[in-house]
Amino acid sequence: MSTIVALATAPMNCAIHIIRVSGPKAFEIINKISTIKIKKETFKIWYTILKDDNQILDEVLINTFVAPKTFTGEDLVEINCHGGIVVANLIIKTLIKYGCQPAQRGEFSRRALLNKKMDLSKIEAINNLVNAKNELSVKGVIGALLGRVSQSIAEFRHELFMIIGQIEVNIDYPEYDDVEQVDAIILKQRLLSLDKKITKIIDQSKKFLPINKGIRVLIIGKPNVGKSTLLNALCNEQKAIVTDIPGTTRDVIESSINIDNITLNILDTAGIHLTNDFVENLGINKAKALIDKVDLILYLIPANEQQDLELYDLIKKQKHLLVYTKKDLVDQYDDKQIYINAKNNDIQSLIDEIKKLFYVQEFDNANIDVLQSQRQIGILENVHYLINNAILNLEKGDTLDLIVADLEFCNLRLNELLGISSEYDFLDDLFKNFCIGK
């Protein structure tokens, strides 16, 4: 295995940079440029000056970590140098000169996975923590980072192992009287109980995913209903030109904001109506094409007008809110509807409805143990499907080997979630609890 090096901090001028070196020759290589002997001792901080021949590179602090008790599971050295990017690059260039290889993207985390320092769920959580868009996203990542999500998946696997093991024993040793026979009713109950737990984490994860990645919001309506005014109010700055002339917005304007601990990725669009203007029609077609590609649609209607049923037909199957703008135009309000005056920044009622629609309060007041990506959710949904297929086959009276085939594939998918080997000897685990051939 090669010894790798990379800048662990952002590639820009700052107060301090951290350069990470990992691999079997980490200490050997660092000692080629250190003016003092960096001993192979763990959890130590060393002050030294780095030199290449007679050229002084920098005055640094070096943190040392000895395998296997490191992030990567390998010998690990972290150099804390001054924050000039030129200085950091010079040190990295020198380390490469003396034997380091430039690290590939994510290679330190990959080595941590290969050396079983953490599972794939935790690895993905680290990346999500770095890219967290708001405090609620951080809260959702922490559950995975601390291993609570991995523990849940491990419990699913263990229960699955026990079920598969019992079935395998019945298939392979039918002649033994002391082997507990598979009871179809009990087996179905165990599978239903397992599926209930899996469904719960799928449902929670689906709810949380838009919050984690940012809620994609499409603002639509007829021309001059206040779409761009709402965008500017949400962003608290003029992102879009606002005039009294219908059709001012002709293209999609996108902006990302954090507001009340949620991230909104907002798309302001051209007003949807019949027009002979070629350019405006392009913008209208873009708006229509986005309808099924967002998490939420805000359909804006002036408070003194009725909704356009033809336009509503385009969005009614998607998650949406009807928002009545220019509330100052009416004297009475329907308590069941949302009224705003974006020109005066009177939009809190809309923000509150968005938070309610995406369960923000629910997540804000509880520990969040959720999957971190659509990929992970998709895998667990496949497990849910396979378990239900096994239950269906059980109810039809199919043979045990057909039922166990679905469950064994469930095991492969759960292993995929954790990034571990899919090889597992079920009988070895089961022999601890079964008395075979005594």
From Swiss-Prot:
UniProtKB keywords: Cytoplasm, GTP-binding, Hydrolase, Magnesium, Metal-binding, Nucleotide-binding, Potassium, tRNA processing
A single GO BP: tRNA methylation
Subcellular location: Cytoplasm
Cofactor note: Binds 1 potassium ion per subunit.
EC top class named in words: hydrolase
Residues bound to K(+): 224, 243, 245, 248
Residues that coordinate or bind Mg(2+): 228, 249
Cofactor(s) needed for function: K(+)
Chief location bin: cytoplasm
GO MF terms held by the record: GTP binding; GTPase activity; metal ion binding
PROSITE patterns per the UniProt record, alphabetical: G_TRME
Annotated GTP binding sites: 224-229, 243-249, 268-271
Pfam family of the protein (one): MMR_HSR1
Cellular component GO terms held in the UniProt record: cytosol
Segments forming domain TrmE-type G: 214-359
Signal peptide extent: none
Family: Belongs to the TRAFAC class TrmE-Era-EngA-EngB-Septin-like GTPase superfamily. TrmE GTPase family.
General function of this protein: Exhibits a very high intrinsic GTPase hydrolysis rate. Involved in the addition of a carboxymethylaminomethyl (cmnm) group at the wobble position (U34) of certain tRNAs, forming tRNA-cmnm(5)s(2)U34.
Summary of subunit composition and partner proteins: Homodimer. Heterotetramer of two MnmE and two MnmG subunits.
PANTHER family, per the entry: TRNA MODIFICATION GTPASE GTPBP3, TRNA MODIFICATION GTPASE GTPBP3, MITOCHONDRIAL
Entry protein name: tRNA modification GTPase MnmE
Species of origin: Ureaplasma parvum serovar 3 (strain ATCC 700970)
Top-level taxonomy: Bacteria, Bacillati, Mycoplasmatota, Mycoplasmoidales, Mycoplasmoidaceae
